[in-house]
Amino acid sequence: MVSQFLVSQLELEFIAIGGRTHLRRAYSRGALKVLRPFPYGEGLVLQLLTLGPGLMGGDQVEIRVHVAPGAKVILLNQSATKVLPARGYRPVVQRLLFRVEGFLEYYPGLTIPHPASALDQRMEVSLGTEASFSWMEMYALGRLARGEVGKFKWIRARTAIFGQVPFYMDALELLPEELGPNHPGVLEGHPYLVCGFWNWESHPFFEETENGLLGVGLTAFRHSFLRGIGNKEVTQRALKIWSQERALRGLPAVDVMRYSSAL
C-alpha cells in the first residue's frame, strides 16, 4: 500500500574557496528542491522550493544545512509555506538542523496554517566559535480574506540555538480551540506573529502603534531577539528593522523581496 504522506529531505553543504562561497553538496528528496544559487558579494543566496500546493498533514520534512568556516549564505523560501489538513488531524512534522561555522542568514518567511491543520516544528542550530547566524520567521494565523484566522488545530514550534552552551531556547505553542488569538495574554486578536534572532548585540527597543507591537531585546549572552504581533505592516516593519541591523553590522544590502514572495 502506498502511503498518502510524503517524506521530504534536503541536505546542503557550503564551503569557502579563495574567499568565495560554493554550494558543495545539495541532496533533495520528495517535495523539497533548490534553485541554482545567486552570487551575493563573497556569498550566495539560495532559494528553497516546496513542490505542490503545500505541506499536507502527516508529511515529514527534514532540512540539514552545514555552513563551513568562511562561507556566507542567505537561505530563504521562495514562497509562503502553506500547512494543509489531513484526516485524523495529523500534523506536518518539520525538523531543521543547522551547523554553522561561517555566516548564515535564514529567512523561511511566512507560514500560513489552513483550517484543521497542525504543525510540529523543531529547529536546532549549532554555532561554531566564529559563526554568525540570523533568523526571522512569520506566521499568519490563517487566510484573512477567507475568515480563517484561528481555524487551525495547533502550531507547536521549538527553537534551540547553542554553542558550547545553550544561547537561546524558545517555545511557541498556539492552540486556538483552547486559547484563541483574542484571548487576553495570547495575541490580543492580532493575525500576524513575527520572531527572530541574531547572535550579536543590538540596541533594545519597543514600539506600540495602531499596527501592533514590535520589539528587540537582549539575551544573557548579549545576543538579540525580535518579537512582534500585529497586522501585515508589523511584519514589514520587522524586515525594515532587520535591514537597519544588517547595515549597522556592515553587511552589504540585499533585496530579499527579489528572491522571496514569502516575506
Curated annotation (Swiss-Prot):
Which keywords label this protein? Chaperone, Cytoplasm, Nickel insertion
- Short name of one Pfam family: UreD
Gene behind this protein: ureD1
Function noted in UniProt:
Required for maturation of urease via the functional incorporation of the urease nickel metallocenter.
Where would you say this protein principally sits, based on its record? Answer: cytoplasm
Asked if the record carries the keyword Cytoplasm, the reply is yes
What is this protein called in UniProt? Urease accessory protein UreD 1
What is annotated about its quaternary structure and interactions? UreD, UreF and UreG form a complex that acts as a GTP-hydrolysis-dependent molecular chaperone, activating the urease apoprotein by helping to assemble the nickel containing metallocenter of UreC. The UreE protein probably delivers the nickel.
Q: InterPro entries in the record, alphabetically?
A: UreD
Cellular component, GO, one term: cytoplasm
Q: So what family is this one in?
A: Belongs to the UreD family.
Gene Ontology molecular-function annotations: nickel cation binding
Q: Does the keyword Metal-binding apply?
A: no
* Compartments where located: Cytoplasm
* HAMAP family on file: UreD
